[in-house]
Every structure is written in structure tokens, then in C-alpha cells.
Amino acid sequence: MGIFLALALGLLGTASGLDYTEPYRPQYHFSPAENWMNDPNGLLYHNGIYHLFFQYNPAGVEWGNMSWGHATSSDLTHWEEHPIALLARGYPNEVTEMFFSGSAVADVNNTSGFGVDGKIPLVAMYTSSYPVSQDLPSGKSITAGQQSQSIAYSLDEGETWTTYDAENPVIYNPPSPYEAEFENFRDPFVFWHADTQKWIAVTTLASLHKLLIWSSDNLKEWSLASEFGPYNSVGGVWECPSLIQLPVKGNKSIKKWVIVLGLNPGGPPGTVGSGTQYFIGDFDGTTFQADPASIYPGNSSANWMDWGPDFYAAASYNGLPNGDVVQIAWMNNWQYGTEIPTSPWRSAMSVPRQLSLQTINGKVTLVQQPQQNWQSVANHQTLQHSWKSVSKGSTKLDSPGKACKIDLSFSDHDSKKSLASTFAIAVRASSDFKQETLIGYNFTSKEVFVDRRNSGDASFDDTFATLYHTSLSAGADKRINLQIFVDWSSVEVFGGQGEVSLTAQIFPKEDATEARLVSTDGVTQNVKLQINGMNSAWH
């Protein structure tokens, strides 16, 4: 019989007395009331509720005692934190099993047999990380440091969970010839594959830059189907995979499969630390075959999902209607994530992003758009401006506050003497603009950028104060279009139709609420600006 981990010690994520107004506290991005958080786990939409589980340390703001925290929402914006779903076994004494990253499904056909009295079981598949050698109730012997794949189930909509101790782990070791990789075998992403009527799970052999694809009839017994990799970027370990299906916009009859994959370290050019890449291809229920255009020679390039430093461990929702795909990522970076100056919590999640495939500049590309429920916290303080020409230099704007949504567009141009070399909006700026975060466009290199070199506190890491950039072409209307989400300690930028994004944390002073436009070396033409203030999702 398993254990009801959610009730252990009565641990609640929500702490009394915290009102989500601490310095740097995100107002419309999820963060736990207190303690350490990293990867999103077990993203599941079921019975009208979005479940967000996450890697969580119940003991403090450092990584450790890995458990699954739990929050729910009806709109992906307003979140309620629940008791810990899967508490590190043995905590607060000697921990014998930690619950590393994984995913969750609603087993609507009760293939697992866990459902009783007509209740649909929710089944989580996760990596059991064992710090000590031990013999398990299932009769399996564990080596210290081993990582294996296990399952747990819930019959009360995710409030309490029972681990499947009779047989866990259900995938004990990596298959031959990879047995030696038992310490780097993790992060199962599980989903129902309708065409073959089977469950599919994708795990990583992290150090070998390989994915293993498994299939099952019942979530309990798994067979190896195929493997994938190494391809493209292999600068660090491969982690946190997803395998998702998306139609190509404009031709609904063409559906492709996409692998989204974390890499740590070895993120996008110009960043240090972790990042997220993707592959587009086909999946037949057994094998993923990447499209030739999705593979680069020499492991020197990749299809980056986000070109900023703070987008990692992107996870996909199971159970969404209409084939929708929404992902949430950890808005942090292993380079400095344990040092960021927040208290009593550490780390936040990205805004939820709706994924699609579109043909951009002749290539099928993964496109991200912010899930539109952010509008539920937009306030009525809207600033709208348009200029035929913004003069060289600085144009001060009314203060948009500490949290806002910005839509900025302007005409592209080639380098001319009278026209700007770069154009940017400065946000979270001090009154003298010595502290500011710049989001803008370089007309010479045709790149969008986020410049956090003067964004605020960067004392905790020598690599933090950096300018990040990536290519962005003008749209068919010859305009550059930017969507910018500003929160108390982050900016997320979506360029064009969403074919590029850059996500970056910032830690400005409390009173840094000013904004301005900066047109360098000349004028910028046909500028349109809309700024919506954002209310707190917590009040």
C-alpha cells in the first residue's frame, strides 16, 4: 500500500502573513508563497481546473528535499497553492527518496486499474531519486544515487496521492547498453497516443544527450520503443523533454510532432547556463524522426525556444481541449538561480504560452503567444500613443508602474544617416534613468534585444548584467512588432508573430517605475505604443 504524501506533516504551501508584496514578488507570474521552486511538473487540465505541480523544497530557499508542490487555477493566472502533493520520503529526517520531475495524466479509461467507484484516477509519473542504497517494498534493490521512473495516483482531483509501492519503480534502470547511466536517467513526460491507443513516455539519458521513448498499455508496465539523439546542442545535460503534436497553420491537414528539451548548461548564444531547444518532425507511436531542416551539423546550432537566459524546463499541459498546447517554464537559470535576491521564496514560472507551428521565412517554426488570460489582471490604466516620427534621443513616458503589458511597433528601415541605429523602450527605470531595462531593436543587425546591464541588482553573479539578442525580421507590413510583459522582477518579450522570445529576470529598486523611448543616432518612424497596467493576481 502506498502512502498519502500530501497530508504528511500537514504542509501547506501558502504561508500565513505573506501578502505577495515583498520586493521582487511577481504579481501575475506564479511563485510559491515561500521556499525554493524549480521545474514545472505534472501540468494537467482536468474538470475545468489547471493543475501546476512543481519541484519544491519544503525546508527553505535552496535546492533540496525535492518534493512536488501543487497549485491550481481556473484561468492560468489566479493560482491557489495546495498542500505538498508528493513529499520527499523521510523528510524532515533522513530523506530516502526524492520526487524529481515528471508529468501527469487523467486515466479516463482506467487502464491502470487505480480507479474505484467510477472515480477517474490522476496518475503522475516522476523520477525517483534515491540518495541512499535500500531495498524497496516492491523487492527491488536500489543503489545510492540511482534515478528510476515511478508512478503515483490520486482519486480526489490531485489533493492526495498514493505511491504505487507494490511495483515502483516501474522503469527500474536504463536499458542495455546504457545501464551505467542509472544516475542520469530522468524526467518522464507521459501522454496518451490516440493512433496506437497506448501511453507514451519520454525520458532522458541526460549525460548522453539521448531521449528514450517508451510505450505502455496501463502506465505500470513499460517497453522501450526507440531512442533519439544526440543532435544539435549538446553543451550540457539533456533534461525535461516534452513530445507534442501541432498542426501547421494554414494547412490543418499537416500535423507535425515537436520535441521540446532542456539543456544545462549550454543555452542560447550569448547566455550562460540553461536553455531550451526544440526539434520538429514526425512520430508514429514508436519513433520520432526529426525533419532535416530541424537538424544542424556539428552540434553547433539549435532551434532555441527562448533566446533569453531565464526560460528552462518547459513543460506541456496534458488534457487540454481542441488539441491546444500550452507550456509553462521555470523562469530562472541554474547559473545563478540559487543566488537571486528574493525572500521568502525563490523562483517564478513564465507566463503560460500557447504553442503553434507557422511557416516563417520559408521554414516551419515553433511560435509562442502568451495565453490570453493575462487580460483578467489588466487594469483600465491604458496609455496609447502614436508618432509619425520619434526624435533622436530620449522621449519620456508616463510611469507605467512595476507591472505592465506593452505593445510596441514601428517601421523597419535600412541604415540611413537620418534614421535610428537602435530603438528601445526602457522599463523599470529610476527617475534619472541610470537604472533601466531596455527592450528594443537593432536596425543594422536586424535583431531584437533585452539589455539588463543596468537593470538593478546584479551583484550575485558576474554573468547576470548582459545584453541578449536574436534575429527578428519585419512582418509583411515592414514593421517590427513586440509584445512585452513586465512584472516586478522579469521581462518577457515576444517578437513578430511569436517566432522569437526572450525572457530575463531583473531586480530593480522598488521605486524604479519610470519608462522612456530611446532612439539612437536618428529618428524612428511610425511608432505605435500601448501600455496596459497589470493588477496583482494575488489580491
Predicted features, each with a name:
Residues 239-241:
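Repeated scaffold domains used in trafficking and secretory/extracellular systems
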Residues 15-187, 192-236, 247-307, 329-387, ...:
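Beta-rich carbohydrate-recognition and catalytic domains
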Residues 17, 250-252, 282-539:
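Beta-rich accessory regions
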Residues 4, 32-35, 316:
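Short acidic/polar alpha-helix capping motifs at helix-coil junctions
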Residues 1-17:
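Cleavable N-terminal signal peptides of Sec/SRP-targeted secreted and luminal proteins
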Residues 244-245, 318:
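Short glycine/serine- and small hydrophobic-enriched flexible loop segments
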